[in-house]
Amino acid sequence: MGEIKDLAEVHNLVSDIFHYPKTAEEWEKYKLSDDQVSHFHEYGYVSGIKLLEEDQIEVLRKELAEIRDPNHPGHHLFYEFHSNESEDSNSVLFHSLGHWRISKAFHDVLWNPAFVMAAHQLLEYKPVRFWHDQLFSKPAKHGGVVAWHQDYSYWTRTVAMQHLTCWTGLDDASTENGCLHYIPKSHLWGLLDAPSLAGDMNGLMAYLTEEQKAEFKPVPIELKKGYGTFHHPLMVHGSYENKSEISRRAFVLNVFADGTVSNTDDELLKGVPPIPKGKQMQGKFFPLLYKNK
């Protein structure tokens, strides 16, 4: 396959998988409705957003299969790579960060116009800057859990809290194969302690008040492949095992509003040069994805 270029060097589309709009009129078709934006702010999430076409899904699936190989020549560019992060010896949960640096298609989903426009709206029309990506793959029959958690509990090394997460399926996601579940309005609970992400599904319960436990009513987010769901950084969410006959492959894009700053002098992602505490998140690894048109 030859030497792999670090695609973090390029802050625009590198393939023809997406068409980037050139006019305000072209952007219009990607906008969320007012009702969708209101749902996000009231409940902490908005789901059922079409982000990918069938041919784009196929390209991403193909590139996912390639980069999952630990012998891939771009393997050293991952921030994290866990062929199995599950703490259950009978389950498998593939999880990685940093594949946008390796795969053209996973690089270009950062600039998917349907994604960046929705993110811009949900971040209250602020410019959108990239934080990091994730891949989660649960194989058929023995896919592991992702425990209940809030994303920002792992991200306090960046401030202010003006982050956003988008989860997109490369397979149909159902309760049978381990789809995402949300606790509606839990984004109003404040910041909770961070449990082990691939450990006990209910580890977070130890940190909840009796009132929060009473409100803990999971809602499954079943989605067709190519559709996404956006959630607030304090949204409590997780996903159960995959006991079905089909895999559950998905990627996650995490972003924040431009102007977010580092809250540590340590490295923010493995192998990424530190950004001094108080300095703005920007540069090679944190590209600006969308600003006001």
Features from the language model and the residues they span:
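Phosphate/oxyanion-binding loops and surfaces in catalytic or ligand/nucleic-acid-binding neighborhoods
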Residues: 67-70, 125, 173, 189, ...
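Short, conserved beta-strand element in jelly-roll/cupin
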Residues: 156-175, 222-223, 230, 254-258
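Non-heme Fe(II)-dependent double-stranded beta-helix
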Residues: 2-43, 49-148, 154-155, 195, ...
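Short, P/G- and charge-enriched loop/turn segments at secondary-structure junctions
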Residues: 151-156, 216-218
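Short, structured patches in soluble enzyme cores that scaffold and shape functional sites
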Residues: 134, 150-152, 168-172, 184
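Non-heme Fe(II)/2-oxoglutarate
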Residues: 2-26, 70, 88, 192-197, ...
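A short secondary-structure junction signal
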Residues: 141-142, 147-150, 158-159, 176-182, ...
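Double-stranded beta-helix
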Residues: 16, 173-236, 260, 278-279
